[in-house]
Amino acid sequence: MSSVKDTMTTQVATVSPNQTIQEAASLMKQHNVGAIPVVEQGVLKGMLTDRDIALRTTAQGRDGQTPVSEVMSTELVSGNPNMSLEDASQLMAQHQIRRLPIVDQNNLVGIVALGDLAVNQMSNESAGSALTNISHQNIH
């Protein structure tokens, strides 16, 4: 069975907590990503998604100079490089996330996206299940 380290993206664009939302959004546009890890001295501190920007910045009347630390999601779900793709898929489905940061001794070493799992033959069923669970989130 393939492990996360064989599939994860290791060249991950990141931002620091003290960068501005405008800088983060520009970096997200440049790399064509909907989420970016927030890292300080190699340690994963949070994730910033396009949804975070829309709901916690724009919708609240804040401007682009708002620090990432005030907008990022800090309740993190992460995986480790040695976990199986099956386990990563299940974790993503359970927490309804499309991107799973991969950490080793608290340091960000990569990221696995739902699309990465979908292209791996061994986890196609799990990726489909994860996508189904993410797409059918419970309304609260």
Swiss-Prot record:
InterPro entries: CBS_dom (IPR000644), CBS_dom_sf (IPR046342), Diverse_CBS-Domain (IPR051257). The keyword Ribosomal protein does not apply. Keywords: CBS domain, Repeat. Residues 8-64, 72-127 form the CBS domain. PROSITE patterns: CBS. It holds the Pfam family CBS. The keyword Transmembrane helix does not apply. Gene3D superfamilies: CBS-domain. PANTHER family: CBS DOMAIN-CONTAINING PROTEIN, CBS DOMAIN-CONTAINING PROTEIN CBSX3, MITOCHONDRIAL. This is CBS domain-containing protein YhcV.
